[in-house]
Regions:
Chain B
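Ferredoxin-type iron-sulfur electron-transfer modules and their immediate structural context
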Residues: 2-185, 192, 197-204, 294-334, ...
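Conserved dinucleotide-binding and phosphotransfer motif residues
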Residues: 29, 229, 269, 288-291, ...
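Short secondary-structure capping/turn micro-motifs that flank functional sites
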Residues: 42-43, 242-243, 281-283, 498
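Feature captures the FAD/FMN-dependent oxidoreductase FAD-binding
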Residues: 120, 124-127, 204, 209-211, ...
Length: 791, 538
């Protein structure tokens, strides 16, 4: 197959010829060709300073790069924690069956569809999530698969491109506003379509109302969600809306101008009044309305304190004016008052003093004191220093950083700029994972706006301080969240961690002192500088100050993005904010801190959420993924899931992580298959400790945590697996499906069974062929009489 | 800080220069911290993690950790050793290949059979002789009478016939006699003659005297090994000729001249024979004890009354010895062979003689007596059909080569053809492999983590490099050397995590990747992943 090498030439010409151009070049090639053709790669070697060994090494390291052509349509199945506990494996199996993908392959024989797993799409509250092409589907089930594929193909055939919500010219009509949350998970639930429908209805109605894009609203469990804000009437929230409701909603709130519209409004209100919902209780769009005084909404919001997410649901993410109008860049201006390039001023030290005094610690996981980190970088000799915003939020089950970048790009830019000024850096990089395209887009757009404004580049905020900011898109490697691996990645290398010391603060990017802070940490900085360190330090516990943003997901009623003061208990988060687990289920544990964290059992739920308390339990604060588990979650399976993840994401450099996690995973797989012996369990425990002690970087050192904590708190479940039982009835090899006497012979299970394991026997009790049964759970879900039992 | 400072390793202070690593400091103290991925020129690569030490409660690689003033390092502790051993065991769990070929592992005397066969194949008979003599006492006898367990393990046998290993020993020893080649290393007239083979003597530490009672297979084998260790050995036997039970073998199976020639080899090595002398009056254990530093009883199967005469504790009709040290309750009296446990196979009786020799040798050197350690070997297990086929492709096809003249045995050419059937499934780096070395030192268990292994793969390149990816431990030295030498193609890590492999870019061959630094990469490979083809194979 010959390819057009001119495209390669163009990309090289645009991106550059230095070694560090490698990853962007490969990203460009993949975008153009759909994969990385060898001829193109060889051409890259000829045209640039990049060595063939680097090209092969890097192209085979990162998940996003493909060395073989793929199907026309890419189906990405999210395998994040929340998706895993919600049954992503079953959805993937259904997709593969439906799309006729042979086992062991990822693409069907006609080259139409490629199904691949993706570490985490960061839409955890919509789990399980599947992305087909650019369309994201939330709350998927095996039964919905055919419908999803149909819907996707229909959108492709009709060329009905969903309008982008990114290039909006926002008209400021003044007066009333309708706020539509347009984070990527809201969009996955159709808020972009709703946005367009509302905008259309609003303009039909006449210009008295502005439909405004805002960032994350936090209440992911109720999206798409909008807020109608009217100066005279206060605000009303609507949840779970669809585009079909747009007109009725606009007309309910806003009086149209012309006669025709007026008549139409009256007519639609009559129609709306006739609509009954299933329960017959409320009518029309009114049934979607909720008040902020609603007990559920209050429980969700009352305990929260919004600092990193200040003005959530109110700000247009890309409106510089709005950001400035709400106190944006005040803090940066203050810091810049006397800053000049090349000279340290007392003000710079004052900034670091404030950060130190605030007690803020790194929100990326380890909780290193931020001020101290800044001071080390500031004290390093040399002119050239770098600041990096770590937006490689790789933990499955975490999406705080994505949401902050998507909703408050200017805030993070301000935080990074303050850090740059404080340590004396003139170049900053946003490292954002490519799985977050909207975050990348918005940060780029925000930087561009600031540059146009003359606020970035040679004159930061118009002063004499030069600061250049750029965005580096990650290429899909969890390990790049580790600072030294992240730096290697920016330098165009495989993302392999290095031994520390030397720390990046001493020898970082290009060997220069480099400050790396997490997105959330930087988002806190402007608030601290604006409101004072004391005010920040007044929130939280003795050693853990301020707030923490959590992605609350899993087996919980009100999932979403929350920001709570440090010291809030796990129980308050799960039961009050999240509303607890589903009725009839038992709250069993929370998985906190992702693959490096651990499982805290429900009996320890009164533990305060702060760095030390969580560490004492064997978990870590982590970046803030908080996945709630109930009695249907198998803890051995959870441990296996995380080991699978870390093993898959290990860079492969050091022995303990590369081989040790593999051997641990093998034992866990044996356990889940009911084939493990006591010796295996003992070896698992011994090896877990040794992998933790002997690995080179944080990824390997913390990889055994999910195993160690589940062994510590749920040993009985391991014991049960040794005896061949899975108490949560999750491990496929240890369970059996059968149909009891309640079966009425309705045949629904037989019709839905994807593998024909249930012969159709109308009006008599059905039987499941255990050999054919794949434990996909479909029959149990569809049975109207709860006659399907799992043993 | 540009002045030297000191750090403490296992309680011992050592002075270091600024910038020096903990590893460098430990070497100054003479500590042997194992390293696989460290090469000074490449700087610390920090991949193997076997050089771990404990500092401030944390395990860190010593090669990449710079010494800092006042640092307290733990190196030779149980905990640190356990971590190093685990690292080695993890590496072995993903290390595909045998250090030692199955035939060698099955040989009670550990003859390096594949090397012998490569010499024969290439017509290097003196070298083949040296290889045999290095391991086997009475090689000519074994070439005729050995029950050749080696051939049962030969992988070639999985395909057609095993290599005729015993026959090759016979060919070499017959050649020695017919050509007048003297396999003894002891040169006449004090000077080594050009035509004599390489020395198989190891220099004496301090001359000690040993009396061996019994000139059967066990006693002669012990005499052979003890003489090689530099001890003065006297073999006593009641018969007029040395050989013990070997003298009873029909001459069709073992002609007397063969046995005589083998005993002559021992004589040339310096073994004294005192024949026709029976233990009893006047030769007593007490008397021998006054004249010799150690006594080894290898008198063969004992009758009840004979045993009583020795006045040593018995278990049934056998002498009671410590199974680990071959020692009887009498000081400096050892016993081995059929007088301790009846041995039916000659080579096993000789292996007992070898074990006893090692016990005696250690005793004479003032060390605790113990049997020789089993050499460490990674074990690949049975080959699957595809792997076997790949091996067969790289060797001479066809079943075993029978000699034209059955009585005369294989000619040199026939022997070469038969030897060419060897699959060379041994590791070329065995004995020269850092991984194997430290596995032995640390008592690593190559099978601690049992799991499905990767497929064995051997890429024999036209230019003479053999690459066996399954043996690569991803130390990164070759990748780094290529980078430093700006190889036009070079080698790269390909893939991520457990699946990472070292390969040339764009699926090219290893040899094309190594245009400048092939020699260096082969020399520095810590395992047998990169080796050169040896003369006589492929």
């Amino acid at each position: 197959m010959s390819i057009d090498l001119n495209l390669t030439e163009e990309i090289v010409a645009r991106v550059g010829r230095k070694p560090e151009a490698l990853i962007p070049i490969l990203q460009g090639l993949q975008e153009r060709y759909g994969y990385l053709p060898e001829d193109a790669l060889r051409r890259v070697c000829e045209r640039t300073e990049i060595a063939p060994a680097s090209v092969t090494g890097v192209a085979s390291f990162y998940d996003m790069f493909r060395l073989k052509p793929v199907g026309k349509h890419i189906v990405r199945v999210c395998t994040g924690t929340a998706c895993h506990v919600a049954g992503a494996e079953r959805v993937e199996a259904a997709l593969r069956r439906h799309l006729n993908i042979p086992s062991g392959a990822d693409t069907d024989r006609d080259g139409e569809f490629t199904v691949e797993q993706v570490a985490c799409l960061g839409c955890c509250t919509l789990a399980p999530v599947v992305k087909i092409g650019e369309m994201t589907f939330g709350h998927t089930t095996p039964e919905r698969v055919p419908e999803m594929v149909r819907e996707y193909l229909a959108s492709q055939n009709g060329k009905k491109m969903v309008k982008s919500t990114e290039e909006l010219s926002i008209s400021r009509a003044g007066g009333a506003e309708i706020h539509v949350g347009l984070g990527s998970c809201c969009m996955a639930k159709g808020s972009d379509k709703l946005f367009h429908a509302l905008a259309e209805s609003a303009s039909a109605c006449g210009g008295s109302v502005t439909v405004k894009r805002v960032g994350c609203v936090g209440m992911c469990h109720r999206t798409p969600m909008i807020e109608v804000a009217q100066a005279d009437k206060g605000s009303t929230l609507y949840a779970d809306l669809t585009p079909a409701h747009a007109r009725a909603l606009v007309q309910k709130h806003f009086r149209p101008r012309g006669f025709v519209q007026h008549a139409s409004r009256l007519w639609s209100r009559v129609l709306d009044g006739l609509l009954l919902d299933d329960s017959g209780e409320q009518r029309g769009v009114q049934r979607f309305a909720m008040s902020k005084r609603d007990p559920g909404v209050r429980a969700f919001l009352d305990k929260q304190v919004h600092i990193a997410t200040e003005h959530f649901g109110k700000l247009d993410p890309l409106s510089l004016d709005e950001y400035v109008a709400n106190g944006g860049f005040e803090a940066l201006r203050k810091c810049l008052a006397n800053a000049e390039s090349g000279k340290r001023s007392a003000d710079q030290d004052a900034v670091i003093n404030s950060i130190e005094k605030s007690g803020v610690r790194g929100r990326g996981g380890a909780g290193f004191p931020t001020g101290q980190k800044w001071r080390v970088v500031a004290q390093q000799p040399g002119e050239t220093k770098f600041v990096i915003c770590n937006g490689d939020e790789g933990d499955p089950g975490a999406f705080m950083d994505r949401m902050i970048l998507e909703s408050f790009p200017f805030r993070v830019i301000e935080g990074l700029a303050i850090a740059a000024v404080a340590v004396g850096a003139h170049e900053g990089v946003f490292y954002i994972r490519h799985e977050y395209p909207l975050a990348v887009k918005r940060v780029r757009a925000a930087i561009e706006q600031m540059e146009k404004h003359g606020w970035l580049g040679t004159k930061l905020m118009g002063t004499h301080y030069p600061l250049k900011l750029s965005v580096f898109e990650g290429a899909g490697a969890f390990v790049c969240g580790e600072e030294t691996a992240l730096i290697a990645s920016i330098e165009g290398k495989r993302g392999m961690p290095k031994l520390r010391p030397p720390f990046p603060a001493q020898e970082g990017l290009w060997g220069k002192p480099t400050l790396i802070n997490n997105v959330e940490t930087l988002a806190l900085v402007p608030w601290i500088m604006r409101n004072g360190a004391e005010k920040f330090a007044a929130i939280g516990t003795t050693k853990s100050k301020g707030t923490k943003v959590f992605a609350l997901a899993g087996k919980i009623k009100r999932g979403g993005l929350i920001e709570v003061p440090m010291g809030t208990t796990i129980r308050e988060i799960v039961e009050e904010i999240g509303g607890g687990v589903a009725d009839g289920r038992r709250f069993k544990a929370v998985q906190i801190g992702g693959p490096s964290g651990g499982c805290v059992p429900a009996r320890l739920a009164d533990t305060s959420v702060d760095y030390e308390s969580l560490r004492d339990l064997g978990a870590i604060m982590g970046s803030g993924g908080l996945v709630v588990l109930d009695d249907t979650s198998c803890m051995v399976d959870i441990a296996r899931y995380f080991l699978q993840f870390t093993q898959d994401q290990s860079c492969g450099k050091c022995t303990f992580c590369r081989i040790g996690t593999k051997r641990m995973l093998e034992i866990l797989e044996r356990l889940c298959a009911g084939k493990a012996s006591r010796q295996h369990l003992e070896e698992l425990e011994r090896l877990a400790v040794q992998v933790g002690a002997g690995s080179l970087c944080g990824l390997g050192k913390t990889a055994p945590n999910p195993v160690l904590t589940t062994l510590r708190y749920f040993r009985d479940e391991y014991e049960a697996h040794l005896a061949g039982r899975c108490p949560a009835k999750k491990c496929a090899a240890l369970i059996k499906y059968s149909i009891n006497a309640d079966c009425t012979g309705c045949t629904i299970c037989s019709q839905h069974c994807p593998v024909d394991a249930i012969p159709m026997t109308p009006y008599s009790r059905h039987l499941i062929d255990d050999v054919k049964c794949t434990r996909c759970d479909t029959c149990r879900v569809v049975c109207p009489n709860q006659a399907v039992e799992v043993k | 800080m540009n002045y030297a400072f000191s750090i403490t390793i296992d309680g011992r202070a050592v002075e270091v220069q600024p910038g020096e690593s903990v590893l460098a400091a430990s070497r100054k103290l003479g500590l042997d911290i194992p390293t696989l991925c460290y090469l000074e020129k490449c700087g610390p690569l920090n991949s193997c993690q076997v050089c771990l030490v404990k500092i401030n409660g944390k395990l860190v690689p010593s090669c990449g950790t710079k010494a800092a003033a006042g640092m307290m390092v733990e190196s030779e502790t149980t905990e640190v050793h356990e971590a190093r051993r685990t690292a080695l065991e993890l590496l072995f769990s993903d290390h595909v290949g045998d250090c030692l070929s199955p035939c060698q592992r099955l040989c009670p005397l550990m003859l390096n059979i594949p090397v012998m066969l490569r010499h024969i194949q290439a017509g290097r008979l003196p070298e083949a002789s040296a290889t045999i003599r290095q391991a086997l006492p009475l090689a000519g006898v074994l070439g005729r009478l050995c029950h050749h367990p080696c051939e049962q393990g030969c992988r070639r046998g999985q395909w057609d016939d095993p290599a005729a290993i015993r026959e090759m020993e016979k060919v070499i020893t017959d050649w020695e006699r017919s050509s007048g080649y003297s396999p003894s290393g002891k040169a006449e007239g004090g000077k080594r003659k050009a035509e004599t083979g390489p020395s198989i003597l190891t220099p004496a530490a301090e001359a000690k005297t040993v009396a061996i009672i019994g000139a059967g297979p066990t006693g002669l084998a012990a005499a052979y090994y003890l003489t090689r260790e530099g001890h003065a050995v006297t073999v006593v036997d009641r018969r007029a000729h040395a050989g013990g039970s070997l003298r009873d073998v029909p001459s069709a199976q073992l002609p007397a001249e063969v046995l005589d020639a083998e005993i002559a080899v021992l004589g040339r090595m310096g073994v004294e024979f005192k024949l026709g002398a029976e233990l009893g009056n006047p030769l007593t254990l007490d008397g021998l004890g006054r004249g010799f530093d150690a006594i080894l009883l290898a008198v063969g199967e004992l009758a009840k009354d004979e045993a009583a005469e020795l006045a040593l504790p018995m278990v049934g009709a056998a002498l009671r010895t410590d199974p680990n040290t071959c020692q009887t309750p009498l000081e400096k009296v050892f016993a081995a062979g059929s007088c301790v446990r009846v041995q039916k196979q000659i080579i096993k009786a000789m292996a007992e003689g070898r074990a006893a020799a090692e016990c005696v040798n250690r005793f004479l050197r003032g060390q605790a007596a113990r049997r020789p350690e089993k050499p460490f070997s990674s074990i690949m297990g049975r080959l699957d059909p595809a792997e076997l086929k790949a091996f067969i492709r790289n060797s001479k096809s066809g079943g075993s080569v029978s000699p034209c003249d059955r009585c005369a045995g294989h000619t040199k050419q026939e022997a070469a053809a038969e030897s060419a059937r060897c699959l060379h499934c041994d590791c070329h780096s065995s004995g020269n492999c850092v991984l194997q070395h430290y596995a032995q030192v640390y008592g690593a268990d190559a099978n601690r983590f049992r799991s499905e292994r990767r497929k064995f793969e051997r890429q024999v390149q036209p230019g003479g490099i053999i690459f066996e990816p399954g043996k690569c431990i991803l130390c990164g030295i070759c990748v780094k050397l290529c980078e430093m030498a700006a190889e036009p193609l070079g080698l790269a890590f390909v893939g991520r995590g457990f699946d990472v492999r070292v390969a040339a870019p764009f699926d090219d061959t290893i040899e094309r990747g190594l245009q400048k630094v092939a020699d260096e990469c082969v020399a520095q490979c810590p395992t047998g992943a990169l080796v050169f083809v040896e003369n006589g194979e492929h």
